[in-house]
């Protein structure tokens, strides 16, 4: 399970054992009485209920910020919203508890066995005999082979989201039958549970199909699971799913699931009007509105994500590492955090790593030791880079002003306040930060085409195996990190990191390498934060998930 990009209008991730002030903790009615806090539960808060406690029938309507044109969740331009939609109609091979504990999904995998043979990790997957794609193609060992071939970095024409782990596989073969896949790694590989949460239909047979086959085409016939595509309108931003008559597992509880694309501010208005059944609370204004809505449950959790500032080193102005260091040195991360959490009675330590989160074993603050807010130092760095202060205070070099384009998405007040804070801080060191406002639906396009100098966005993790994705974050060909600051030297060191046989050894080395990689000054973490959802009372197995992956057929309304 890899990481995906998410636009920065969403505040996510809370540290263990926190309480968030200013919102109700009542689980029946948001108007039933004034309560001071809602608990931030580190292992998820999504009303887990057994199937016999959930009604048969009903509909679920949810907001989404973008229905991206790229529907392949494994593609390098995939974003969180695309992955959210993908999971409703494609094989969900594995499940997880909120703390990240991994389980095979019995609807697809009847048994999984991992062992070490001659120094190599060998994982055997027994596939459910009934598992089949919507077009009748069996889900067998070939889907594992297809997944491996398109994510192992061997074909330079394939634009994969991440090759971490898959590039460590030596072979994928059939076992005792076509319904058994045997995955053999090149050496001992400690993160094997991070792989094959998803699989690809064997019809994805070449790079062009992988890269372009899902553009404005969800390929419902290549899907499988309890739900199938009912409507997928990329223009209107409406996507819906209904029960799949070809599903072999437990009957899905809902009659229909609908996503509607809307801007961040519109999501809370739609929830207040009863037009959607759940909404993410991203700022104090959303929180205030959610508290007024009857029959609402507020849910808070730890959802591992890093929000970050990215500098595009591929642009002429930012290709100089001294300029990038100056920009980061001139940004007060504490100020950005205060803007993010304004009115939410919440504080946290500044994040310092993209490899691990602050509550994970082995975490180190690898960024904080490199960069501290210091305007005088930032100005000195710009002096050294040849940018001198002009009469208006803006730096100049060779007759050109030091102007950077900061692209934002959506219309939320949080986005505007963050932009204003960034402009003020950078103006103080002589940088003219021009804000370019774009609709939320442009996020994936801007990311894919690097149409920015400065960007705030997020890296969202789906599992606790962060070091397993070190290459995805820091390699020179990363499709996640759009700063363009990777180097061949770091690529070589990452390859050596991935050869280490234990998680402990990889974590230790990853911390050392991250300190080096961050000295390219391409990405800067500035907050994690709480994830809050407002949901209608009775919504089961949905909300703030942390690391949880629940069976889609079990989402529904409590009896």
In which residue ranges do the predicted regions lie?
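Aromatic- and charge-enriched surface segment that lines or borders ligand/interaction sites
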Residues: 110-157, 182, 317-319
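N-terminal lobe/hinge region of extracytoplasmic solute-binding protein
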Residues: 58-116, 222-223
